[in-house]
Structures are given as structure tokens and as C-alpha cells.
From Swiss-Prot:
This is BRCA2-interacting transcriptional repressor EMSY. Residues 149-177, 683-693, 911-921, 937-953, 1025-1040 have a biased composition (Low complexity). The lineage of its organism: Eukaryota, Metazoa, Chordata, Craniata, Vertebrata. Residues 961-976, 989-998 have a biased composition (Polar residues). Its main location: nucleus. Residues 16-100 form the ENT domain. Homodimer. Residues 149-179, 191-216, 676-720, 797-816, 905-998, 1020-1046, 1139-1173 are annotated as: Disordered. It comes from Danio rerio. Residues 1148-1159 have a biased composition (Acidic residues). SMART domains: ENT (SM01191). Signal peptide: none annotated.
Amino acid sequence: MPVVWPTLLDLSRDECKRILRKLELEAYAGVISALRAQGDLTKDKKELLGELTRVLSISTERHRAEVRRAVNDERLTTIAHHMSGPNSSSEWSIEGRRLVPLMPRLVPQTAFTVMANAVANATAHQNASLPLPAETANKEVVVCYSYTSTTSTPPSASAPSSSSAAVKSPRPASPASNVVVLPSGSTVYVKSVSCSDEDEKPRKRRRTSSSSSSPVLLKEVPKVAVTAPGPKTITLPVSGGPKISNLMQSIANSLPPHMSPVKITFTKPSTQTTNTTTQKVIIVTTSPSSNFVPNILSKSHNYAAVSKLVSSAALTASSQKQTMVISAGGSSVAPGPGPVAVTTVVSSTPSVVMSTVAQAGSAAVKVASTRLPSPKALIGSPSQILQIPKAQQAVLQSAAPKALQGSISTAQSTALAAAGPGAKPTIQIKQESGVKIITQQMQPSKILPKPSSAALPSSSSAPIMVVSSNGAIMTTKLVSTPTGSASTYTRPTVSPMGTRVATSPAGATYVKTTSGSIITVVPKALATLGGKIITTSMVSGTTTKITTIPMTSKPNVIVVQKTTGKGTTIQGLPGKNVVTTLLNAGGEKTLQAIPGAKPAIITASRPITKMIVTQPKSLGAGVQPSTTTKIIPTKIVYGQQGKTQVLIKPKPMAFQTAVVSEQTRQLVSETLQQVNRSAENNTTSTHTSAAAAGLENRDDTHTYTEGSPVPSDSTHDAPPVVHLISSRGQEWAEQEVSVESSPALIYQELTAESQSATSTIKALLELQQTSVKEKSEAKPRQHTIDLSQMAVPIPVSAEQRESPEPSGQSAAESDAHTEFIPIGKVSKAAEVSASSTPGQSASAVSAAPHVVKISTAAVTTQQVEAQVKPQQEQVLVEECELEGDTLDPQTGLFYRSSPQQQLSRVCEAASSSSSSSSSSSRRAEPPLTVKILTHRSSSSAPATAASANTPHTPQLPRLQQAPTTHNRPNTHTQLSQPPPLQAHHPVGSSKTSSGAQVQQPIITQGATVTKITFGAPHVPRAPVSSSSSSEAALKLQAESSSEKPSVPDILKISMMEAEIDPGAEPMLVDSSSDCGPLTKAPAGPSLISSSKQTLAHGPFSRKSKELDIIQVIPQYSIMPDSSQSNVVVEPSGFLEISDYTSQRLDEEQAMEQEVDSSNDEGAAASPSADQSQ
């Protein structure tokens, strides 16, 4: 025959050798597989294989490895089982044994071990609630990708979602096809394409009325919704196709492990406004076009149907124009994917979504959060998670689109208390089972530094916060509506177009806007921790920040406020005290207290907004809201009805920090300075009006300290701020109580050493330089007064009484929290989340600590990146974690004597350059705090060094030496003491005043010896936590906090946080009166030291506020853990707040995003701050 093709190919000898070897190996492997499938190894087969090994040049090791492969192949094993019966692998197993057995290896210890363990524990906990893999073998996994084109109509949208054949969908059009092509081009094999069945079973509520088959369909907005048949739903908006594919890919990669059946709905941004979404998903959009709002929004936000987001099934696909009204009542044109940004995140179990719509005219922000229980660890409430979405979804939005409205919906109870629409700001509070989100937006946008978005005169951008608990990804997007009221979020408006959401399922999810403002960063670990997510939105890279930290089981309250208008109103929920303070550009502060909320939040005048989140989940109906503190740019808000909340902002991720950090820092520093001045001016004048005027409260802090009677009431209110910390516990109410008590102590310490704190903050430094020394000397008495006041209110507080119940949990969970929080400290959000996680899973303290560590590590890592002090951060984190291990679980403080000392030394070295004494004292605190101190001292050193150093300089050495030793020992002592103290707590509350008083002077003395004070307060704190310590502590904190707020603004409050921390801690100690006296000498100094350190830190932290925040957060975290521990953490947290006040704002936002979890203030409030902390 003629040769049709060449018989010799262009192959070199080497190539031929390689191909031959491949053929030989494949042939041998094929023979082994065939013989294995026939049955057990016989003598004949063995001889045949021996011959083949020689012919094919197979080594003995290769032969044994192939045999092991065949033996371990379930497919071959199954075939052999059917062909030759059971027990057909014994000889094969013998033949496949290794000549040299593998040596057992030690478990490697790396920097990520703690994080990995925490994640593994969290995942194991979640998986424990899932069916065994064997039980799911025959179940269909549904992955639906709906890629709807922009032109698809709502009906068509519903069709594509059901058929999962979208116009543009790359996936095969036939619903029966087994392959789904992701937009990114990757393919997913699915057993069944129909998403509806899977979804209906797990969550009928999620089903949208319009389309049963589509879990989430968002037409208007580019969105990615991933819904697990379980309670997990993740929806991510994507502005661009490629981004969508990336999101899709990341979601697909990350979600599958956590959710068994995963439903992914990918919707390309479409002009259609109708969205069919499962109830769980709440979409918040501020879109130029009124029809843009997804029906979910329309339904939930629908003014006419204000309350019906509750039932998922009830969710109507039809989008309401009314919702549109909110976005831009006037604009009917859909800007397309660019202008509209919608982010919805539903966590696997709990789904929490915050929606904010900025109206053109009224710049209204609406937030709807579905219950935020973390799916696995929530002790609350698997059932709640399922139920709540429906009930919680209901959002009351009573205001007309033009009038900003705060609408509050409680997940559990439909009862919503809608405060009258605020003058300009609109506040929406939604309480989900685990999370309460309050969004407040002011119409006028004094905040926005750039009117760049002014370009869109009609677009007003409102931050969108998505909170998911339990590993849900949270994204915050700033979207601008093409409305006349672009004032507030002008810059964000630009960002909506340029927003891009990058989500790594496990990693941080952040949305970045073209304008450069940072939207959200959610650290993976935090998200994974479950129940903790922090979303931070910075508007025009300045003051607007939205942070939500969903607690796994306890509700979080997130208040997002923008200072757009002159008047700011805070709305509270009926039965729950929510205090929100907005800082107006004008500097006006209007506080709307919820009935029962005693303290008003005080805000310093500044265009920066302040957010406070307070929510009692179950604790004292409205009286004790477990609060998530929102960090306010340059402002701290204290005072929630019985709890004091400290707003701590976590430092933003490195990338975020870079973008907004400078501007924010400037704003913060300016604000701080202003606050300082006002504080100085107002210090004497307004301690009484602490509740009344947020700004003045700060200033009044000093006065408050002096005038203890008035502050007591205020303080009571203030404790809610502290409360946030405690809210970290799984039972928000209960844990909050325990945490609260710690924060209360902190606040007192701050109050006592408010001057120190002030010095910490630059403005405070100035204010305090004059008064720091005076107050440091006189402060002890003031502290004492404060403490006593606090003590008095504590016993009086109903919260306190409630707190005993929680305190019981708190005692048990508090320990978990403490361990958990230290890492959480890094990000308050993490902390809160951690706290809540432990609380939720009363199951495992150990697990909680792991989680906390994870969040800390993640937060720290991110924060460090932001701070550019990763090493220090990591060290801090590690130390924190290690220390946590070292310390008793009760204290929850992770202190390592050597690491801590090193850290303090390092911090001192760092701060020595700027302000050695103040930094060292701060550093002396906990390692985390120490590091932060160093950074802070670098930035604030000049201003703070003088004021802080003077009072603290002598103490610094002590702090350094003692912090490690005292702090450590104190911590240990406290740790050992906490249980008794906790048991003693109820009694302690009355004693608190005396103990606190005693300790306060100590604190004052130990202004430099912050560490020592820390230790002592911690012990008292734990006791407080245990009985009604959280309540009492919170109350104390609230009291101190109210007092402190009166002093200087945020600065003072920050200072108060720092100082009050010690003071508050002592107060907590007071609560556990034993603690106060017992740890009095050591504790007092310790507390003082911590507050002083915090104060010193405040200024320094401005520069290195990110680190500071992180460090502080661990301390903060620690505090929640045990009342005493909490105390320790809180002081730093407060300090961080101070820092946050000035510079930390950015960081906090970033942190919050990371943690986003919000609680810690992180949850949006400071969840992130603390969350990030």
C-alpha cells in the first residue's frame, strides 16, 4: 500500500524514551488494576507481576506503590468484592506494604496553626449538624447558575432561574444538563439542575413568590447569590462580567465545603428591577433607577408593605416602585450594572443582609438583616435561623422615601418601634435573631469630602451592608442613586459604578469602589468563625462606615450613621435600647434614646459619623440591648440603655487603609483635636448632659468623674457601650451582661484616667496634658467616685439583675469568650463574633477560643498589613493566642509572660522613639495592646508623648516590667479568681462601688501601670460577669461611659474608654466587690496602667492605630471572656476607640470589614472595630 502518512515522526530519542517510560508505567498500572479487580493476589499473579517488573523495569518501590494505589481504590475494591467476594485484599495489602514504614511525624506548628485549628473546629462544629456523607450519597446537589442578561424581563428572569438556562448563561441551556459552566468558564457537574426542589425543602421562606425554582434572582443588580439548601445563602453583587465570574468561582470554591447542597444563582446586572430572591436574601440597593430595587427590597422596604420581608415565600417578586423611591424616587432609568450596587450576603445558616437604599431626595438608608444566628455555632438557634428569616425579614419602613426613616424590625418580634423619621438621617434598625442592624443616614452629605459623585446630582450613595453570620461573606457596597440627594454619599456614588466585589469564600471579601473608598473587608477567618462578619463602608473615604458584626446567636445591633444633615436622630427599638449618635458636620448631635435607654450617646462635632449599635438579644427586654459598638470616625458613642458601648473601629485591611487611611486619619485627627478642645471646654460643663448630649458627654467625662451622682445615671446608659464587648458571648443578652460589666469597668477606669486616655488621643492629650497630671493624681478619687456611682447604678440597673442570668452563662461562656476574644481583640468584630460564637456554642469554650484566635489572626494579619506592622501584629496575635492558652480560660486573656514582655519591650522600643513612657505603659498591657501602643506612640507620640509621658513616664518602666509580670500574674490571679468572683458577682455588684473606688485610685496611681490595673480589674470583672457582672459591668461602664462621654468628645470618651476601662474594670471589680479589694493593690495599678497605656496609646495609636486597634481588641476580647478578662480587653478596646476616634477610623472600618462581623463593634459597629480588634 502506498504510505499515506510518515511512519517516522519528528520525535527525538529523549522524547521517545519518555513516552516509552510512560507507556511502561501505564501498562504496569493497568495490569495491577486489572488483577486487583479480579480478586485477591494469587501466586500466579505474583509471578506474572514479577516478570512484568523485570520486563517493564519497574522498581520494587514503584511496584508496592502501585499495589497500594490499587488496594485503596474503592472502585477496584467494589469490583473485586462482587467478582470474588469479600476479603479480597489481604494479600494485596501485604504485597503493598512499605519496605520502610513511615515514621510518625509531629504536628507542625506554624504561625497559622491557631487559625487553622480554629477554622477546623468551627468547620467541624458546623459539619456536626450536617448529615453524614453516606446519608447524602443519593441526594441531588443542585447548582443553579442563572446568568440573566441585562435585558431579561422579570418574568424571563424567573424563567431562566427556574430553567437555569439564562439568555447569556454559559451553562448548557437544558435544565437537565449535568454540567454547569460558570461565567468564569469553569464547569461544575451537577446531578440535578433544578434548583427549586432543593431550595424549597430547606428554605421555603427563601423562595421568592415569583419563581419557586430560582433561589435568588437579582436582575437589576449584578449579583451572585449562592444558596445552600440549608440556611446558607450568599449573594454577591458583581459589577462586571469578569468580576462576576471571579466571584462565582471563589464562591463555588469556598462555599461547597461548608454547604452540602449549594445553590448558586448568578445574575448578571440587568436593567430589570424585579428580583426574585429567596426571603433570606435582603438586597440593599441605592440605584439610580427606582425600579432597580429587587423585589426583596421592594417587599421589605416597601413603605406600603413595610413589614412583609418576613416571609420568604411571601416575598413578592414584584419590585415596588416605592422601594425605588427610596433609591431615587425620581429616577426611573436603570443605570445598569455600574450605578447600582447591591450586595446581599446570606450566611449558610443565618442569613443577614443589610440593605441600604439612599433616596435621591432623602438619602434614606434601609437595612434589612435576616436573622444573624450563625448556622452552626449559634446556640440560639438553628431553628431560629430557619424561622427568623421570615419573621426577621419584616422591616418596618414607615417614612416616605423622601423623609429619611429609621425603620426597625425585630426578627423575633414583629413589634417594631420606629422612631419618628429623624430630621434628615434615616435609621433603619432590624433585629434578626442574632443581629440587629441599625442604619442611619443623614440627608445632607457634609461627610462626603468629594462631591465627585456630585457628578451624579441625583445619585445619593448609601452604603450597603451585607452581614452574614457563620462564615457568610459580607460585602458592603456604596451605591449611588441618581437622585438629588447625592450629598451624603457623593463619593460612594462614583464607587457604585466602579465598585467591584472580590470575594474569596474563605478569605476577606471586600468591595472596592472606583472612587477609592473602601467598602468592606471581611477576613476569612472571621467569616468562617461563623456569626461574625464585619462590613465597613467608608464613604468618600472619610467618615461613613458601616460595620456589622453578626453574633452567632445573640442579636447585634448595628447602627450606621451618616452625618448628612444637621440634625441626627437615633432610633431605638421599643423594648430595646438603641442609641445612635451621629456626628454632624455642624457638630450638632441629636440623640434619640429608645425608651428605657438612659444614656444618650455623645458625639463630638465633626462631619464624621458615629455609629453605635446596641441590641439586647434576649437580655432585659429593651433595657439591656446587647450592643455592638459601631466605631465612629473620631467619635465614640457610649450609652445604651443599660449598657455602655464602646465604639471601636478595627483598623481596615492594608489595602483599605492605603486607600482611605490618610484622609480618614486626617479627619480623625482633626476631629480628635476638635473633640479635645471641646472636651476641654466642656469638661466641666456637661457631665450631667452626658445622656442628653453625646458630644458634651465626652467632654463631661472628666466632670462626670468628678460629679459621680449624675454620671451614675449617665453611666448606666453608658454601660450599653461596654455592653458591646460582652455581647460577644453566644447569648448576646447574657454574654453582653458579662462583657458589659467588664466594659463598665473599663469605662470607669477611663473615667478615672480619662485624662490618660485623653493624652492618648492627641486632642485628649492636649486636654489632658493640663489635666492628665492633675487628674492622674486627682483622678483616683474621681475614679473612686465614678466607680461608686457606677456601682450604685449597677445594683439599681435592671440590666444588672438580668445580668445574673446571663452572668451564669457569662461565667461559663465568658471564659470561652475571653479566650475567644483575645484573638478577637485584634478585631473587635472578631472579638464580638468570637464572643458570640463561644456563647452560641456554649458547646465549646475551647472551640470558641480557637475561633477567636482565628479571627484575631486573620484580623491581625489584615490589620498588620494595613498597619505595615505585620510582624508585630502577628507576634501580638500569637502572643495573644499563646497567652490565652497560658491564662486561665475564665479570664480569657491570652497572655504569655515571655511573649508579652517581649511585645511590651518591642512596643516600648517602638514607642520609645515617639513616646517611650506612654507607649511602654500601653505596651505593657497585653501584647496586642503593647504593639498597638508602639504604633500609636509613633503617630501620636509628639502630641501624646508629652501629656501621656509626663504622667506615665515614671510608670512606664513599671508597666513594662509589671505589665508582663503584674498583668500576667494579675491576669492569672484573675483567672483563678474569676469563677469565685463570678459566683460572687451578685454580691459584688453592690460591693463594686467600694471595690471600684479603691481600685480606681489604684488605677489612677497606676496610670502608668496600666498593666497592673488591668490585672486587678480583670479579676473583678470576671466576677461581675459571672453574676450580673455583664449587666453590672455594662451598667458601670455605661455610667462611666456616660460620664466619660461628657468629658471630651470621642477623645475623652476614648480616654474614658482607656481609663474608664480600668475604672470600669474596677467597677466590675466592684461588682465583684471581692475582686476590687483583693486585687486592689495589683488590680488598681493594673487598671490604671491599662487605662494609662490605653491613653498613651490613643495618641500613638493614631499613627499606628491599626496595630493599636488590633492589640487593643485582643484585650477587649479578653475582657468579654471573663469579666476581669473583659476588663483588660476593654481598656484596650476603649483605647482603640480613642485611637479609632482619630485615626483608627479607617482602620476600624477596615477591621470591621474584616471582622465584619460585627460585633465587636465589629459588627458594623465596632464589631469591626473590635471585631477587627
